[in-house]
Structure formats: structure tokens, C-alpha cells
């Protein structure tokens, strides 16, 4: 395991849909297996091939509500009739073991983490331009026009929140953005 100045540090990465969060996090985890990527809890049913504790922690609605009520989530939200959240206990356990912990979450979740875990280092991932973000979203060719317009409207709002974050990384080039993330997270190369 590589030594890292990020040991025991919680880092939050957020940014609008289509900015490349997933690609950057995947690359970062391949380069730095010492990073622990937080596993979300959800009330939705497990999909075929999903493993409890690997992909998600699958909870019924009552158990999820108990977890939230007890302060056991760093952040949570409801989406499409299901609840999703970041359980506090596994994050704190990994931090106590000295591992750098990474949360890849949406803007509202990042705001909740800012309140519940203020020492977390928060990074906003931004596109080089709004036009490039739109090109990426349309390039996926998976959504109808109405969904694309919703994503773009939400992205405009999210981009206005950049100043709330400890750092902003512009994802114009994947390799350069990964190097910037490594530096911000204090990861040895």
C-alpha cells in the first residue's frame, strides 16, 4: 500500500452530470488502491449482480429512517421514490484505520456533508465550458430531449455553487484532472 498524506482524510467530489466524475474516480481508484470509496445505503431493491456491502447497503425504509434519525448518515436524499445516503459508521471506521476515504456525491449531498462532517475536503469538478458539458451529455445518446434539458438546467444551477467548495478542478483532460486530484488529496504518485 502506498503511503499517503491523505491517510485518514475524507474527500468529497461533486459536479454536474456529464462532467466526468465517474471516469475520474475510476482512474483515481486504479492508481490508488489505498483509497476507500464510500458505499451508499439505499432503500431500493438490489439489482441482479449487485452485492450487499459492495455496491450498496440495502435497507428497508424503516431501517433507513432509523439510521437517519440516529444521525447515522453523513448525507441522504430521496430520488425516484427510493432513499440513498452515506452511512457514517463505515466512513469513520475507514478513516480511523488511516485510509483516505472518497465520496462521489451530488451537490445537495456535499452540502449536507459540509454540515455533518465539516473537516471533509470538498472538490467541485467543473467542465471547461457549459457548451462542452452539453456536448458530453448529448453524446451519451441515452436520454430523450426532455431529460437532457432537465440535466442541463440542473447543471447551470450546480455550476453556480463552485465557490462553496475548497477547490475546483476543471475536467478538460482526464490525465491532467487526475494529477490535480492526486495533488489536492495529498496522494503520492
Curated annotation (Swiss-Prot):
Known SUPFAM superfamilies for this protein? Answer: P-loop containing nucleoside triphosphate hydrolases
Its annotated function is as follows: Essential for recycling GMP and indirectly, cGMP.
Keywords from UniProt, A to Z, are: ATP-binding, Cytoplasm, Kinase, Nucleotide-binding, Transferase
Q: Which reaction does it catalyse?
A: GMP + ATP = GDP + ADP
Its cellular-component GO annotations read: cytosol
Task: One Pfam family, please name it.
Answer: Guanylate_kin
Q: Which organism is it from?
A: Prochlorococcus marinus (strain MIT 9313)
Q: Which Enzyme Commission numbers does its entry carry?
A: 2.7.4.8
Record's PANTHER family?
A: GUANYLATE KINASE (PTHR23117:SF13), GUANYLATE KINASE-RELATED (PTHR23117)
Q: What region holds the Guanylate kinase-like domain?
A: 8-186
The GO molecular function terms of this record are:
ATP binding; guanylate kinase activity
* UniProt-recorded name of the protein: Guanylate kinase
Task: Kindly give the NCBIfam families that the UniProt entry links to this protein.
Answer: guanyl_kin (TIGR03263)
Q: Which residues bind ATP?
A: 15-22
Family per record: Belongs to the guanylate kinase family.
Family matches, as SMART domains: GuKc (SM00072)
Name its cellular compartments. Answer: Cytoplasm
Q: Which residue spans traverse the membrane?
A: none
Taxonomically, what lineage is the organism?
Answer: Bacteria, Bacillati, Cyanobacteriota, Cyanophyceae, Synechococcales
Amino acid at each position: 500500500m502506498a503511503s499517503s498524506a491523505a491517510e485518514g482524510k475524507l474527500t468529497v467530489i461533486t459536479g454536474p452530470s456529464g462532467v466526468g466524475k465517474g471516469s475520474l474516480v475510476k482512474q483515481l481508484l486504479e492508481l490508488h488502491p489505498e483509497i476507500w470509496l464510500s458505499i451508499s445505503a439505499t432503500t431500493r431493491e438490489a439489482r441482479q449482480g449487485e452485492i450487499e456491502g459492495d455496491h450498496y447497503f440495502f435497507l428497508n425504509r424503516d431501517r433507513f429512517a432509523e439510521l437517519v434519525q440516529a444521525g447515522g448518515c453523513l448525507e441522504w436524499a430521496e430520488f425516484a421514490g427510493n432513499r440513498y445516503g452515506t452511512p457514517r459508521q463505515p466512513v469513520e471506521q475507514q478513516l480511523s484505520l488511516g485510509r483516505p476515504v472518497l465520496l462521489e456525491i451530488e451537490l445537495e449531498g456535499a452540502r449536507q456533508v459540509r454540515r455533518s462532517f465539516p473537516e471533509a475536503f470538498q472538490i467541485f469538478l467543473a467542465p471547461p465550458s457549459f457548451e462542452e458539458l452539453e456536448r458530453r451529455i448529448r453524446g451519451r445518446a441515452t436520454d430523450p430531449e426532455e431529460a437532457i434539458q432537465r440535466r442541463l438546467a440542473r447543471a447551470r444551477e450546480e455550476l453556480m455553487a463552485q465557490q462553496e467548495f475548497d477547490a475546483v478542478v476543471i475536467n478538460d483532460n482526464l490525465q491532467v484532472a487526475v494529477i490535480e486530484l492526486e495533488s489536492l488529496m495529498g496522494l503520492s504518485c
